[in-house]
């Protein structure tokens, strides 16, 4: 019998699109209500980038997925910076419109890709959390998208053969199993809440947050480098 902890062993192709859709409904109204000056706020998780830069990166990445535009160094730091620079003359509204379209249209493309693009959807959701932190908004790495993000994180880490981890989450009814399921390495163990687990896997700071991690160092969990 398949349990919720085992679901990630079989890829759900619709999961990335669902995560993007939920986040689109939550994030875009928040951003459109913000003043122009807020988009110049620095984003601590992305040194050297402002909120505007992060959103330009996110909108560009989704447009590349929708349009199947993959340069040789696509999604590399250099490619990401070029995408941001190309949008330097855009208005905030234009960037948000591109992001809106991308979050609405990328899901089916990611689904058909078979798995390699699943991490793009997860990265978009993490960056939405980065933006919330920069703007002082509540709900960073949490909210309605968290259950979908955790399921996608399990799916992505399993596909990549990442180190195995068993997570007992304060805010979930069932444990979450992440990473390699071969059994070759004993799973690490995490006890804490979902947003903290996401922060660890995304390489975001978890200062002053109570959690337990045994069998692995926090740095080993980072899937974004």
Segments predicted by a language model, with ranges:
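Short, helix-capping/interhelical loops that line the mouth of catalytic, cofactor-
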Residues: 2-15, 59-111
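Structured surface interface patches that mediate subunit assembly and partner/cofactor docking
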Residues: 2-15, 41, 70-74, 112-225
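Structural signal for well-ordered, non-membrane alpha-helices
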Residues: 24, 28, 32, 62-66, ...
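Short, structural beta-strand-to-alpha-helix junction motif
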Residues: 50-51, 91, 193
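N-terminal capping/interface segment
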Residues: 1-37
